[in-house]
């Protein structure tokens, strides 16, 4: 039986600590690792793909059981290129991360990290999106031991069709109280736009936002991580509201 093959990507870029530390740990623990990641940070780009310019694949590093490539594209591009171009056969599992910053609740709609894992699930490959609390300790070995156990469990048990796992990890230095299987919480952003002027007098804007968390209970990823639990949320990317389908089917609408 050969080594377990892993495709790693992220939205923080190919030189980010999270992806490089995870790649090294998995390589040292018997996995065959391929990294395909954006050449620069592409955070909050959601599920964008590149259609109107060429994609360029650049080898960064190659050694036994570890190959690293950068592309001038998005996280979802990276998954597609990794599967269709770089790897000889589909990986056993796809991991997006480890992201510097949590991706919880409705944040996942904006997240390049989560969208890359969704892209993997679209291929029918088990996929994880993994995020660590911002400025958390990427050298914490307990985090990698946990992730290895989770990978092994996913490969042993499998995941439901069209489902991925969104994993959010508190900073271990603050203490970890355990692991919870959670549901998505709700976060909204109150956007503010700061107006400035360039040297030619033309105005431009920086967008900033204040987070508001609403109606979150103990079952949610948001509350669980706040209380020191690692959150594992199964995400199914069928966005259909089936209750609304039943209701709308009774509407009388004619052409």
Swiss-Prot record:
Q: Which family does the UniProt entry place this protein in?
A: Belongs to the SurE nucleotidase family.
Name the chain's protein. Answer: 5'-nucleotidase SurE
Task: Kindly state which keywords UniProt assigns to this record, in alphabetical order.
Answer: Cytoplasm, Hydrolase, Metal-binding, Nucleotide-binding
SUPFAM superfamilies in the record: SurE-like
- Spell out the InterPro entries in the cross-references: SurE, SurE-like_Pase/nucleotidase, SurE-like_sf
Q: How is the cofactor bound?
A: Binds 1 divalent metal cation per subunit.
| Functional note | Nucleotidase that shows phosphatase activity on nucleoside 5'-monophosphates.
What cofactors does this protein use? a divalent metal cation
Any one GO cellular component localisation term in the record: cytoplasm
Binding sites annotated in the UniProt record for a divalent metal cation: 11-12, 43, 99
Gene Ontology terms, MF aspect: 3'-nucleotidase activity; 5'-nucleotidase activity; exopolyphosphatase activity; metal ion binding; nucleotide binding
What's its top-level EC category? Answer: hydrolase
Its lineage opens with: Bacteria, Bacillati, Bacillota, Clostridia, Thermoanaerobacterales
**Which domain of life does the UniProt lineage start with?**
Bacteria
Kindly list the places in or outside the cell where this protein is found, as annotated in its UniProt entry: Cytoplasm
Question: So what EC number does this one have?
Answer: 3.1.3.5
Catalytic reactions on record: a ribonucleoside 5'-phosphate + H2O = a ribonucleoside + phosphate
Gene3D superfamilies registered for this protein in UniProt: Survival protein SurE-like phosphatase/nucleotidase (3.40.1210.10)
Database matches in Pfam families: SurE (PF01975)
């Amino acid at each position: 039986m050969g080594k377990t093959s892993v495709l790693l990507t992220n939205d923080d870029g190919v030189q980010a600590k999270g992806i490089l530390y995870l790649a090294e740990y998995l390589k040292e623990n018997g996995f065959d690792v391929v990294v395909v990641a954006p050449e620069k940070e592409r955070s909050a780009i959601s599920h964008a793909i590149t259609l109107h310019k060429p994609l360029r694949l650049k080898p960064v590093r190659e050694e036994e059981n570890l190959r690293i490539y950068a592309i001038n594209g998005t996280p979802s591009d990276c998954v597609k290129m990794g599967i269709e171009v770089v790897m000889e056969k589909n990986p056993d599992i796809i991991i997006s991360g480890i992201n510097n910053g949590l991706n919880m609740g409705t944040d996942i709609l904006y997240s390049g990290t989560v969208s890359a894992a969704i892209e993997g699930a679209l291929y029918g490959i088990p996929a994880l999106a993994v995020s660590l609390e911002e400025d958390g300790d990427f050298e914490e070995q307990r985090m990698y031991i946990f992730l290895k156990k989770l990978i092994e469990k996913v490969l042993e048990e499998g995941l439901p069709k069209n489902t991925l796992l969104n994993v959010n990890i508190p900073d271990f230095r603050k203490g970890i109280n355990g692991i919870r299987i959670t549901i998505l919480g709700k976060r909204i952003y109150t956007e503010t736009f700061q107006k400035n002027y360039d040297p030619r007098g033309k105005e431009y804007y920086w967008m900033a936002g204040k987070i508001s968390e609403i109606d979150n209970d103990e079952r949610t990823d948001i509350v669980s991580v706040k209380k020191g639990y690692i959150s594992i949320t199964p995400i199914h990317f069928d966005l259909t509201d089936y209750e609304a389908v039943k209701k709308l089917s009774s509407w009388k609408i004619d052409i």
